[in-house]
């Protein structure tokens, strides 16, 4: 196995809160997959939930070396937790096609948050 990419992102939670206050659920609709959307709608901390998902997806786009463009969208990267609570990534659409093209075999996600920030790192391996 070889490392194909590494991405890190940090999000100021207040910034996400301000966007939600200004534009309602538009950002959440653009960023979240259908499964994440269902969780977000009833989550006890929806702003923090969205900020963490946003950080992971930005980090993933950086790890893939593309950013969010050329057919890639935030909602094609889905963050979920495994049976131990560890954050994982599931890919859809163009993100999945890109992973297959690059020969991605493993994706590692780490996520941390404090009062004001959410931070994520994603490593992709062949």
UniProtKB/Swiss-Prot annotation:
<dbReference type="GO" id="GO:0000287">
    <property type="term" value="F:magnesium ion binding"/>
</dbReference>
<dbReference type="InterPro" id="IPR002582">
    <property type="entry name" value="ACPS"/>
</dbReference>
<feature type="binding site">
    <location>
        <position position="9"/>
    </location>
    <ligand>
        <name>Mg(2+)</name>
    </ligand>
</feature>
<dbReference type="InterPro" id="IPR008278">
    <property type="entry name" value="4-PPantetheinyl_Trfase_dom"/>
</dbReference>
<keyword id="KW-0479">Metal-binding</keyword>
<keyword id="KW-0460">Magnesium</keyword>
<dbReference type="InterPro" id="IPR004568">
    <property type="entry name" value="Ppantetheine-prot_Trfase_dom"/>
</dbReference>
<dbReference type="GO" id="GO:0008897">
    <property type="term" value="F:holo-[acyl-carrier-protein] synthase activity"/>
</dbReference>
<keyword id="KW-0276">Fatty acid metabolism</keyword>
<keyword id="KW-0444">Lipid biosynthesis</keyword>
<comment type="function">
    <text>Transfers the 4'-phosphopantetheine moiety from coenzyme A to the 'Ser-36' of acyl-carrier-protein.</text>
</comment>
<dbReference type="Pfam" id="PF01648">
    <property type="entry name" value="ACPS"/>
</dbReference>
<keyword id="KW-0443">Lipid metabolism</keyword>
<feature type="binding site">
    <location>
        <position position="58"/>
    </location>
    <ligand>
        <name>Mg(2+)</name>
    </ligand>
</feature>
<dbReference type="GO" id="GO:0006633">
    <property type="term" value="P:fatty acid biosynthetic process"/>
</dbReference>
<comment type="subunit">
    <text>Homodimer.</text>
</comment>
<dbReference type="GO" id="GO:0016740">
    <property type="term" value="F:transferase activity"/>
</dbReference>
<keyword id="KW-0275">Fatty acid biosynthesis</keyword>
<comment type="similarity">
    <text>Belongs to the P-Pant transferase superfamily. AcpS family.</text>
</comment>
<dbReference type="InterPro" id="IPR037143">
    <property type="entry name" value="4-PPantetheinyl_Trfase_dom_sf"/>
</dbReference>
<keyword id="KW-0963">Cytoplasm</keyword>
<keyword id="KW-0808">Transferase</keyword>
<protein>
    <recommendedName>
        <fullName>Holo-[acyl-carrier-protein] synthase</fullName>
        <ecNumber>2.7.8.7</ecNumber>
    </recommendedName>
</protein>
<dbReference type="GO" id="GO:0005737">
    <property type="term" value="C:cytoplasm"/>
</dbReference>
């Amino acid at each position: 196995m070889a490392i194909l990419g590494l991405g890190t992102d940090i999000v100021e939670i207040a910034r996400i809160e301000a966007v939600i206050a200004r534009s309602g659920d538009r950002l959440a609709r653009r960023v979240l997959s259908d499964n994440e959307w269902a969780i977000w709608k009833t989550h006890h901390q929806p702003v923090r939930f969205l900020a963490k998902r946003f950080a992971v997806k930005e980090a993933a786009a950086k790890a893939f070396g593309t950013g969010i463009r050329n057919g890639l969208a935030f909602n094609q990267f889905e963050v979920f937790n495994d049976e131990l609570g560890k954050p994982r990534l599931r890919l859809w659409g163009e993100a999945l096609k890109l992973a297959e093209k690059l020969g991605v075999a493993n994706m590692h996600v780490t996520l941390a948050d404090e009062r004001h920030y959410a931070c994520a790192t994603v490593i992709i391996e062949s």
